[in-house]
Amino acid sequence: MNYFPWLTLIVVLPISAGSLIFFLPHRGNKVIRWYTIFICMLELLLTTYVFCYHFQLDDPLIQLVEDYKWINFFDFDWRLGIDGLSIGPILLTGFITTLATLAAWPVTRDSRLFHFLMLAMYSGQIGSFSSRDLLLFFIMWELELIPVYLLLSMWGGKKRLYSATKFILYTAGGSIFLLLGVLGIGLYGSNEPTLNFETSANQSYPVALEIIFYIGFFIAFAVKSPIIPLHTWLPDTHGEAHYSTCMLLAGILLKMGAYGLVRINMELLPHAHSIFSPWLVVVGTMQIIYAASTSSGQRNLKKRIAYSSVSHMGFIIIGIGSITDTGLNGAILQIISHGFLGAALFFLAGTSYDRIRLIYLDEMGGIAIPMPKIFTMFSILSMASLALPGMSGFVAELIVFFGIITSQKFLLMPKILITFVMAIGMILTPIYSLSMSRQMFYGYKLFNAPNSYFFDSGPRELFVLISIFLPVIGIGIYPDFVLSLSVDKVEAILSNFFYR
C-alpha cells in the first residue's frame, strides 16, 4: 500500500502552480510560456511515473485510493482513485494539454490569464477523471467549465462572445441535470447521504427511479460529448475559438462526456442502461450519418472538422450501447484515438489560418506548393481520421463493429441494419475529409495572389504534429497499448449486467 498522496498532488499541482503565474516578473511573455510548459511537462512526467510504478495493470479494482474527510456534515470526502478506465483519459489529458500550451505560443494578449486558465482547466479535467465521489466529480466538472468559457470569450474570432454564451448555456443547462442526478443518488434510501462511488454502485433502485436518474445523467453527458440534437454548440464554438482552445475542446472536453456515460450511467445504473442501450446504438448510428453528411456542406474549415468529430463520437456511443466487452473496449480506444486526431486536425487548421488568414474553404486553394510540410501532415492526419488501416481510428472503429456484431442484445436484422448504416457513415467520412484537402491544398488560387509567399511550418509546429502522429501510428499498429489498460475494468463493469 502506498501512502503518499500521489493523486492529490497530480490534481492540485497545475492550478496551484498556475496561480503563481501572476507573480512572475514582467519580462515579456517568454517567462510565462516557458513556465507553463515546464509545469505541464512536470505534471505529465509525474503522472507517467505514478502510473508506471504504483499502478497494477491486472487489478480491475480501484487503486491509489485517497480518502480525506472534507465536510463532515454530509459525508463529503476528498476521494480520489484510478482504475483502468480513467488511466487512459488522464494520460491523454496530460499529453494534449502540454501540446496545446506549446501551440498557444503566438498568444500574446493577456498571456498570464490565458496560461493560468489552461492550467486551471488541466486540474479540473484530471480531477473529474480521477474523482471517486459524486459531488467531487460534479465540482471538478464545473471547475473545468469556467476556464473554457473565459478562454472562448476572450481569445478567438469575431463571434466569440456569441459562441461562448451558447457554450455556457448548453453546458450549464446540462450541469443542472447532473447536479440533480448526483443529489438524487446521494440522498436516496438512507438517512445519511452517501456520495461514494463504491456504495452507489452496489445500491439497487426501483426501475422507474433508476430510469429517471439515467435520463438526468444522460442529458448532462449528451451535451458534453455532443450527442444529437444537443450538439449545436460545438460547431459554433470550434469555429470561433483559438486553436489551442480547440485542441483542448476536441481532445479532452468531448471525452469527458463519454467517460461520464461509462463511469456513471453504466457502472451505477446498469438496469436502466440495459433498457436504453438499443436507443443509444440507434442515436449513435444516426449521429454518424447526420454529422458526416452535414460536414460536407460546411464552408468553414473549423466547422467542418467540428462536425467530423461529432460523427466520430457516434462510434463511441455505439460501443457504449452495445454492452459487450469488445464494443466497450472499442469505445475506449476510440476515445483515446479521437483525442489525438481531433487535436491534431484543429491545430493544423489553426496554423494554416495563421498563415493565410482565410477560414472559408472556397476561398482557399493551392496551399500545397508554398507549404509542403503542412500539406503532408494534413494529408496523413486526415487519412488517419477517415480510419486508414494502420492508424488508430481504423482499429477503434473495427473493434466497435465487432462489438455490435457479437452483441447478445440485438436480433439479426437490427444488427445487419446498424452495421449497414455504420458502413455508409464510414463511406461518407472520406467524402468530406478528402474534399477538404482538395479545396485547401490543390489548384492555383492562392498561388497566383500578389502576396503569395507563405512560411511553411516551423520546428515548434512540426514537433507538435509529429508528437501527435507517433501515438496515432503506435496505437494503430499495436492497439494493446490502450486495450491492456482497460480490458480488466471493462469485464468488471459488464459483470453487473446479469442478463448476459
UniProtKB/Swiss-Prot annotation:
Keyword vocabulary terms for this entry: Chloroplast, Membrane, NAD, NADP, Plastid, Plastoquinone, Quinone, Thylakoid, Translocase, Transmembrane, Transmembrane helix
Cellular component per GO, a single term: chloroplast thylakoid membrane
Annotated InterPro entries: NADH_Q_OxRdtase_chain4, NADH_Q_OxRdtase_chainM/4, NADH_UbQ_OxRdtase, ND/Mrp_TM
Catalyses which reaction(s): a plastoquinone + NADH + (n+1) H(+)(in) = a plastoquinol + NAD(+) + n H(+)(out); a plastoquinone + NADPH + (n+1) H(+)(in) = a plastoquinol + NADP(+) + n H(+)(out)
Superkingdom of the source species: Eukaryota
One Gene Ontology term from the biological process aspect of the record: ATP synthesis coupled electron transport
Molecular function, one GO term: NADH dehydrogenase (ubiquinone) activity
Subcellular location: Plastid, Chloroplast thylakoid membrane
EC number(s) per entry: 7.1.1.-
Membrane topology according to the record: Multi-pass membrane protein
Keyword Lipoprotein assigned: no
Transmembrane segments: 4-24, 37-57, 87-107, 113-130, 134-154, 167-187, 208-228, 242-262, 272-292, 305-325, 330-350, 386-406, 416-436, 462-482
One Pfam family per UniProt: Proton_antipo_M
Family under the similarity heading: Belongs to the complex I subunit 4 family.
Listed HAMAP family: NDH1_NuoM
PANTHER family: NAD(P)H-QUINONE OXIDOREDUCTASE CHAIN 4, CHLOROPLASTIC, NADH-UBIQUINONE OXIDOREDUCTASE CHAIN 4
Stated name of the protein: NAD(P)H-quinone oxidoreductase chain 4, chloroplastic
Organism: Vitis vinifera (Grape)
Lineage of the organism: Eukaryota, Viridiplantae, Streptophyta, Embryophyta, Tracheophyta
